[in-house]
C-alpha cells in the first residue's frame, strides 16, 4: 500500500530559446515566475510563444522580461489591448535580483531566458546568467558537435 511519490515534479517545456545556448556560455540558472494576463496564459497553452530575441532588464529593483513574443489568440476580446511584445515582470526573491543585478553591473554578464515551462500549474521561466560567445567560440562549438556526431556514426557502423 506504500506508493512511491516522485520527488521531482513533472516539468513540461512550452518554449525553448535555442539561440541563447548558441550565443552564450551559461554561468548560473534561476527559475522565476511571470506576471501574466488571462489571454497570455491561453496563448501559452496554445503554444504561441517565442523567446528568441528576449532578455532581462532591471528597473526599480525589479526584473523585467523584454522581447518575449506571446501571440494573442484570434478570439481575444476586442476591448482588450493585446500587446504581444509587452514587458512582463519576473517574480524573484530580492536576494536573487541583487545577485543577478550585481553580476550584470560588475562582471558585464547578460541575463537571458532559456525556456518557458509549466511547474505544477504555474508558468515559470528559466533565466540564465550568461557570458557572450565570440564568433570563433561559436565555430569551435559547431566543430566539436559535428566531431561528436561523426564519432558516434563511425562507432555505430563498426560496432
Swiss-Prot record:
Signal peptide: none annotated. Pfam families: SmpB. It is found in: Cytoplasm. InterPro entries: SmpB, SsrA-bd_prot, SsrA-bd_prot_CS. GO terms for molecular function: RNA binding. GO terms for cellular component: cytosol. Disulfide bonds: none annotated. Its main location: cytoplasm. Keywords: Cytoplasm, RNA-binding. One of its GO terms (biological process) is trans-translation. Belongs to the SmpB family. Required for rescue of stalled ribosomes mediated by trans-translation. Binds to transfer-messenger RNA (tmRNA), required for stable association of tmRNA with ribosomes. tmRNA and SmpB together mimic tRNA shape, replacing the anticodon stem-loop with SmpB. tmRNA is encoded by the ssrA gene; the 2 termini fold to resemble tRNA(Ala) and it encodes a 'tag peptide', a short internal open reading frame. During trans-translation Ala-aminoacylated tmRNA acts like a tRNA, entering the A-site of stalled ribosomes, displacing the stalled mRNA. This is SsrA-binding protein. It comes from Coxiella burnetii (strain RSA 493 / Nine Mile phase I). The lineage of its organism: Bacteria, Pseudomonadati, Pseudomonadota, Gammaproteobacteria, Legionellales.
